[in-house]
Amino acid sequence: MSEKHPGPLVVEGKLTDAERMKLESNYLRGTIAEDLNDGLTGGFKGDNFLLIRFHGMYQQDDRDIRAERAEQKLEPRHAMLLRCRLPGGVITTKQWQAIDKFAGENTIYGSIRLTNRQTFQFHGILKKNVKPVHQMLHSVGLDALATANDMNRNVLCTSNPYESQLHAEAYEWAKKISEHLLPRTRAYAEIWLDQEKVATTDEEPILGQTYLPRKFKTTVVIPPQNDIDLHANDMNFVAIAENGKLVGFNLLVGGGLSIEHGNKKTYARTASEFGYLPLEHTLAVAEAVVTTQRDWGNRTDRKNAKTKYTLERVGVETFKAEVERRAGIKFEPIRPYEFTGRGDRIGWVKGIDDNWHLTLFIENGRILDYPGRPLKTGLLEIAKIHKGDFRITANQNLIIAGVPESEKAKIEKIAKESGLMNAVTPQRENSMACVSFPTCPLAMAEAERFLPSFIDNIDNLMVKHGVSDEHIVMRVTGCPNGCGRAMLAEVGLVGKAPGRYNLHLGGNRIGTRIPRMYKENITEPEILASLDELIGRWAKEREAGEGFGDFTVRAGIIRPVLDPARDLWD
């Protein structure tokens, strides 16, 4: 819908059942506490199945054994995924030791999964361990509040270990924004931390009694790195610095990648520039964006409820004017900024504070002791001696941050002995997948388990065509919800069915263009045959410094997506 013909500010109609659930939940309590004591099932029932998401958990089951258990007349092997709230991805070594211990002793899979939302997840928490995991997190100053469902999720912040002063300032703002937009209900503390019920009535001055219409994602990004993939997020604060000091932010609103196969009312969308704001208005503006989306977002259709759809319905200028009105400011013109990349700098980087930072490539973010590569044990050993902190990146990697020169050799020795510094190709460093099977209930095709061998094949093609020192930003997501951020990749695979994917081309290296579907519902051999031909052409015909995605557009292989709300599906 164009600016000239804006739609209604509020969508009238029958509200979704999720709205009923939130309203009746008594500020997210439901009957979760009672359900915890029901030993007849390993899962949560009724509304509680969805309400636990507000407490940072998803109920899942092992899909590899689902059919087998059904044959045995057993319920699915229910277990929870828990996602920690960790603004900016910074975690202390004491906290790391606690989560390592819990993962090893109290989860089915024994792993820590770093995510591209800059936090960690536990998979396979049985119901009896759900309360203990929240209490363990609390004991080391962490929580899982608002990391899922209709709230402001974990706030991302560029992992920039080199410019330590600027990163420190941006990180503080990521924490402040996260805290400011948290729900105020005491449900989390009452249910998981056994804090006593207080007679006062809960109030949610920012989120409201029915919270947001849909999930909401926020970033703080420090150019020229776009490692956090700004355009995948609802609200983005782009850091503007003068003489290395943060002075304000450019605000971009309305990005998001989730689509539904065949539903042309859904689309991925890049965020729209609203303007520049000085630092002192940051929290007021963040609150204004969230409350405008709270009041104007579509509560009659969850597939059309995110901020990107609200912007398209009411018009960018209308939404922006409402944010200005609520925040009591006028945006200044956007200040100049540019992105040059979004990958992590793997290996040692010296910061301007003379400390060293070691970025470790963790394939798919999965930390486990593999045969000959005890990654989990290695990181635990480093955590025991390292005086700085760890930082999870939005590329699912891990930074050992703030290493003094005197400790460098000791940490490198452990990292090398544990397989944490094994050499990988540039292509593998720039490839990513979501979890998908066996734990994700939405998975349509493999992603995390598919990626390593798929990249082996891509590496072979890169060698064949003489471009093995290059990379293509390549991502696999197991379903169109898009957790793997394939809809901002140069080559994006979106799961369609077991062993089949939609192949998207035409994104760019810096993550500012949505790719278009090139081929639908194809197998791995068909994908590789297409990419063999196209990588060969790119190797021969590209211009100096031209990335694969830009080449596919310039060469006319794929039409660029210019206005996704209108031309993504053309």
UniProtKB/Swiss-Prot annotation:
Task: Identify the SUPFAM superfamilies for this entry.
Answer: Nitrite and sulphite reductase 4Fe-4S domain-like, Nitrite/Sulfite reductase N-terminal domain-like
Cofactor notes: Binds 1 siroheme per subunit. Binds 1 [4Fe-4S] cluster per subunit.
**EC number(s) from the headed UniProt entry:** 1.8.1.2
Q: Which GO terms describe its biological process?
A: cysteine biosynthetic process; hydrogen sulfide biosynthetic process; sulfate assimilation
Intrachain disulfide bonds:
none
Q: What does this protein do?
A: Component of the sulfite reductase complex that catalyzes the 6-electron reduction of sulfite to sulfide. This is one of several activities required for the biosynthesis of L-cysteine from sulfate.
HAMAP family, A to Z:
CysI
What name does this protein carry? Sulfite reductase [NADPH] hemoprotein beta-component
